[in-house]
Design a protein with these regions (language model features):
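Cap/lid segment of the alpha/beta-hydrolase catalytic domain
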Residues: 2-128, 133-135, 170, 256
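Active-site-proximal cap/loop segments of hydrolase catalytic domains
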Residues: 16, 22, 87-300
Length: 300
């Protein structure tokens, strides 16, 4: 990857923590510092403007890792600039950062801050060609970004997005629920504070949609049950919103069905890239599966 792109890891800031144990302590309300990976395709003409994609990773707690390597190669081949934020709660940065998690909350603003950082620091990025895409937890962050900042994104893709935290708490294990009700996180269960879980759920914010959006889900998803995403789709339709979606039937790969390296996964990703390209107009769009295959091993 490094041969075909400039890669950097930068440090930036988001809002102060939501939960502050000692509000009067020195620096207690300082902005949260977090990292983000920056990927700039080599050989692009820096005298011209280029589109930006924001790519938040999944979770609950995770980080941006090599699972996204082929997706990055495919985005690089299209000459997208990419920023991948390691928003609060990401792993690999110690217990304190882990416990800053704010699922469906301030992590959304960290991601938005990474978008703004790119526009402020790289003058070859076109502010009118900015998109966002993510899967699972990253899909939830994608949805909240376009709901809260609709004028700042021209297009979005949400793959198997976590959509309804209340429903999700009903079918997940107690250990999973404990991640949310922990004192350092939400501090209450969905039963104890329904409104707080609604606030963090895209399905209850569907009325805010203004940005062109594509949603994909899979009926055999073992992580984000398809009924969560169906609830989101129904909510968007009830609000008479314009968007695109596809519910895939039992595609191998389950939750990761369009992120693995199978032929079907590549076909689905090609649809995603075509959706993004309609609004971002990259220099070298992927128009076929052949283009996508070549992105894995040939410079474009």
């Amino acid at each position: 990857m490094g041969k075909y792109a400039f890669i950097d890891k930068v440090t930036l800031t988001g809002p102060p923590p939501r939960v502050i144990e000692n509000p009067t302590g020195q620096g207690a309300k300082n902005p949260v510092r977090f990292s983000a990976y920056v990927f700039i395709p080599s050989g692009i003409d820096l005298s011209k403007k280029h589109p930006l994609l924001v790519l938040p990773h999944g979770g609950v707690h995770s980080n941006f890792n090599t699972f996204y390597r082929h997706i990055l190669r495919e985005l690089k081949a299209q000459q997208y600039v990419v920023v991948a934020p390691e928003y609060r709660g990401s792993t690999g940065y110690g217990k304190g950062f882990y416990e800053l998690i704010d699922y469906g909350g301030l992590e959304v603003e960290d991601t938005y801050a990474s978008r703004n950082y790119m526009l402020e620091n790289y003058d070859f990025i076109d502010k009118n060609r900015v998109g966002i895409l993510g899967w699972s937890h990253g899909g939830l962050i994608t949805l909240h970004n376009i709901f809260e900042h609709p004028k700042d994104y021209q297009v979005a893709y949400a793959g198997v997005p976590v959509s309804d935290l209340i429903a999700r708490m009903g079918y997940k294990t107690q250990g999973y629920r404990d991640l949310y009700s922990a004192d350092y996180h939400i501090g209450k269960s969905a039963y104890e504070d329904v409104e707080e879980y609604r606030r963090r759920s895209p399905v209850w914010n569907a009325y805010k949609l203004q940005t062109p959006l594509l949603i994909h889900t899979n009926t055999n998803d073992g992580d984000v049950n398809v009924f969560e995403v169906e609830h989101l789709i129904k909510s968007l339709k009830a609000e008479d919103k314009e968007f695109e979606y596809e519910i895939y039937e039992d595609i191998p790969g389950g939750h990761s069905f369009d992120r693995i390296d199978s032929q079907k996964a590549k076909e689905v990703r090609a649809k995603v890239y075509q959706h993004l390209a309609r609004y971002l107009n990259p220099n070298q769009p992927i128009r076929s599966i052949r283009d996508l295959h070549q992105a894995s091993y040939l410079p474009r």
